[in-house]
Amino acid sequence: MISDVSLLKSLPKREILSGYAEIIKYGLIMDKRFLNWLLDNESKLMTFNKKYLIEAVFHSCKNKAIIVRKDEKEKNIRAILNLGHTFGHAIEAINNYQKSLTHGEAVSIGIMMALDMSSLQGNSLNKNINKIKDHFQKLKMKTKIPNNIKRKTSLKKFKETMNSDKKVKNNHINLILLRTLGKAYLANRYSTRKLDSVINKYIN
């Protein structure tokens, strides 16, 4: 794979931040050292320091390759690459895929929802969630569903939209959650009451 990071300078900052949601995802799901590196170097990344951009892209590609090599047909561990996407895809669909919200922005919000759900499930995240939220907010990434999208949905509609996700099995929504920072898992058993609580928090 060849990546010319100098091309990133041709993109508006909004698109850079949309892509960054996918980059930090790799730190959250499987590589805590990479996650900490991203947190420590946020200012250099957002000023497009070439050395740091190369490092970020390299580790993202490397981590994805590790997962895909283990599960080429997405039957098991590859599902963790979808952290934030089950919620994010629902947000995009409710917004009719309009350009007012990019895919990366929807994933960014979805990651926040997945972190909250992980915490409610009792996983070891409470003290770390605010650190990630602060990082997102400092970079001006999306962490809340915009009001114009909130007005289009309800708990019932949001869950019905989530049911179209590819991870749904036998009409049951499977979620990608975190046990701790750097360790994700496919959750097919969880409290639906807690899921409702997370959705309501973001749509109200």
Please identify what each model-predicted range represents.
Residues 36, 41-156:
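Active-site segments that bind and position negatively charged phosphate/pyrophosphate groups
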Residues 25, 29, 47, 120-123, ...:
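Residues in soluble alpha-helical coiled-coils and helical-bundle/repeat scaffolds
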Residues 2, 82, 176-178:
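Short beta-strand segments
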Residues 8-10, 88-89, 183-184:
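Short, acidic Gly/Pro/Ser/Thr-rich loop/turn segments
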Residues 21-26, 58, 113, 160:
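Generic alpha-helical structural context detector
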Residues 21, 123-204:
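C-terminal charged capping/lid subdomain of soluble metabolic enzymes
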Residues 1-43:
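A glycine/threonine-rich phosphate-anchoring loop and its flanking beta-alpha core
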